[in-house]
């Protein structure tokens, strides 16, 4: 008979733990066959293990490289097109001119002709450089001089303009005499006022252009502009934005209440990434503000570049650059003279030493302008007479180069103006320039619209181009060959993501009116008002509608005060005194109907409010989100030419939105509940007395939304696992974990020979970058100070406290309770806090809620009354008025107050308890549901006569806190640092808990088993059933001694026996840990180009048309190895070149991979091997496993390096010691420190275990001796240092790459294994994904007969 079993999975982003569990919570062992050429034929293995792998990465790096390649290719193409236009005429003047230019990079012996690139002779070349020291001298000369000039010089000037053509951020015409600093400042103020509540800077109408374009320091500019706004503080938010705008570094930590610094500076290369990180914390709605600040900054920069006021020149940019050049020359002469006189001993360092940040380093290119200025300031600061230099440095106008970071602020129109001037002058002498003027200008002005994408011919994964013809695309025929409209449609389809819940529906733009309306109602539906009588209630449908029309349509940002004013006017009879449920910190709604306010400035209000126009408005916002290109916006808005005026279209063109929502129109306002025919938005607007929000509506079993979503998520073919997993929404890292877990399940089912009863899944949460939780704890003191002040207490004056100390919850609760016992009102003594109890308002018997909201400080838990319910009525009667004061001062939340006073409303009801059950059990994360769905569809394929699924395999999803609670309860401590077994143990405990819960509470099955079951309602069941388990935390049965059986009398849980089994499994020394072998992909080598030298190790930068010898041109080093190969072949030895058979490891780089795979034998012969036979080549990807003497294992890192391959196993008591050592810093839990103190002698035993392990497997004798000496010198005086040192010591024994660690504050350097010779005669172990199947190859036996 087939024995039933369950599979447990613990899925993470770089590991998957797995376990097979039988009915009595044991893990079976199987005798597994071993293939290969060793004496081992079978090994008994426990069906318990973990797969470790490098986590999946996003495609960002690949994308950045791809776009850079395209940019350079297109730039090169522009130059080739220009040469094509010039070629015929240039042939008459100098037919080898273009060849010489192309060869200018090459060393003399590699050139095809003369070594002087422009004129081909030294004399003319020298004269040219004297006349035109920079290209800008030539550009101005050609633009302003009416005489005929050598055609070669005309080409050089135009090629420079076309190569570095400026940015395209400004559309249409651009006046170089007026670059709009004032207008852009006004635009910035408008966005600023829109973004921040109660800001009206725009109204002050100040003139700033003169200040911002003046030659004064950045700080002076900021200060002068700030003075024009008398109400703005010098350390305020507006001042911080001014810092940014003038080009200084700003830090928004304080202004957005962030935990860490948030520095931003427009001139930094990392600006884009730093802004992205900031917006991830504060919200995308600030993106437009930073964009308008950046436009203003660029415009100020440009005014600093275009410094020439000479109206006569037709080349203002070139003239400004010449002025910069001349100033540089004069200032350099002055600086040299000054340093000779005042600092003669420093002269050589400044002007000759390239390694320093002086002038030599600056001109060489190693030192940037910022570092050079810093160096000079340090040198000149206290020297008399250096004021001139320091003043220019302060203005950032000293010894400036021609090519600097701020050249990025030059619009292409300025270059175009110079190009036209040059062509106009020279076309008189070269008519072909006039004939081809449009084509030449097009080379400068034409850009491939981003919505057309790459111009590939159907061979690229990244192209979506639609063509009208197969001809080659050039800047001049683009509109004839490319179907822009179809390409734009395809772009829309690629750009928009799919809904998380309805995977075949596209999401709405973030600024869609429908989406914004949804977010407003979703937030509003959970806001409660409080009346004078102390009654609290949700807003009804009528009030919500009135608030939406009267507040959200009137104010862009809705604050608590604005809503209160409205309610006082419109709902005076309700006597509303307070609101709860808003963002506590800022007292504002996070949601806004902002797009409505934007469109109100352009379109008629009646048009916006007319429901018939909803579709049109959604399409307009979609267009404004997808396209920045005004021409395309105009084209798409032509569909509404009968509704929109030309003026309105013009205004809409300038409006651009960014960002996407996460939900589709179909989900929000498409699918309807079967009975009521209402959509989700309809329910948010009017939900009777329930006032459910979005998450509650889609998870409510009484409505059909849940069923509709489940139906929409059914996947088709499940055989192609890669496709199935790639289609779900989630990061590459978590998808990689999911894919591996599905493969593991397949292998386990194959080994067991039949399907499991249950598959229990738990998924790790990814580290998402959210500041909310951390910000809350970081801001404890700030919030406390305000509330204590409101409460009218002196407690903070009497007992001052630092924010860091408030991380101790006991102390924090003391202040939140104003130093009094929460249940008696008596004073507590701050010096004896450790003797008081922390009590859970809702007992832990029902739910593990350790939040501040569920805990109070009391002199004794007895003070609460009954221990199995909320605090008693007597306590409530006595303390309610005190609690109310705490609530008014915001020292406690409404939720805490409601729970404290619950007894007067009958205490905990059955419904409450049903809710607790759900919160503990029901995994709400969508990604986990996706995994459950995939497993369900792979294993449960049969249906009954009613077409209902027959679920033979139950897919159980568990919340991760169930396992951690279970571990704590039975002291099954987890210390990740010891080894990787904890992944397997978590999977095992998941299976245990899932299996036991299913047995003990079959009626709870629908809550955590995937599928369409009738759901359980606590209050609808008969009272006896409800009582049976509802009066407890669902995990409590594990602790009780009574035996639990199922309806057939089978034992499900027998505490002593089963806990004993569990402990036994967790102490198994044999757990199958597999490090996934992976072929390396990506770049060929490190990216730095190294200078030429005699090294043979350099890789040439070019090999195709022309070979760039690394001895002449330098090259790359550190090629990335795709995989290694073990080869047995002959090599020639000694002078006689006698053949000798060798066994060797050869690294195959990513660059060589294709050559090797095409013909391995020829590849190795080129490397000097002879008599190579394919059967004597073994491919070894990274992390291949080798076994050596005494069970020592090594992983292959590369052909030249190994890593550690053994896992240390510790006895239970040492695991317990390390658990407490790891948590010793927790002030709230003194038991950890006590335990370590009592058992500190066990660290000696731990060191012995590590020492024995190290001698056998790690083999780092020097390090081991150093560790022992340090332990002897520091024998446990400082317990915290002792504890952290031994946690760090586990790095020494950990599997994988060796790493440096600290032991008693001294660095223990890593011991690298840089010889791979020892594995050539070891046993190679090929493992399957679970490690249960193995092929062992004794490399000693290879290569013989």
UniProtKB/Swiss-Prot annotation:
Claim: Signal is one of the keywords in the record: no
UniProt cross-references to Pfam families, sorted A to Z: Cas9-BH, Cas9_PI, Cas9_REC, Cas9_RuvC, HNH_4
Any one GO MF annotation of this record: RNA binding
NCBIfam families assigned to the protein according to its UniProt record, in alphabetical order: cas_Csn1 (TIGR01865)
Annotated signal sequence range: none
Domain HNH Cas9-type, residue spans: 770-921
Binding site for Mg(2+) 1: 10, 762, 766
Notes concerning its domains: Has 2 endonuclease domains. The discontinuous RuvC-like domain cleaves the target DNA noncomplementary to crRNA while the HNH nuclease domain cleaves the target DNA complementary to crRNA.
Gene: cas9
Applications reported: The simplicity of the Cas9-gRNAs RNA-directed DNA endonuclease activity may be used to target and modify a DNA sequence of interest.
Lineage of origin: Bacteria, Bacillati, Bacillota, Bacilli, Lactobacillales
Protein name, as recorded: CRISPR-associated endonuclease Cas9
InterPro entries with a match to the protein in the record: Cas9, Cas9-BH, Cas9_PI, Cas9_REC, Cas9_RuvC, HNH_CAS9, HNH_nuc, RNaseH_sf
Protein's organism: Streptococcus mutans serotype c (strain ATCC 700610 / UA159)
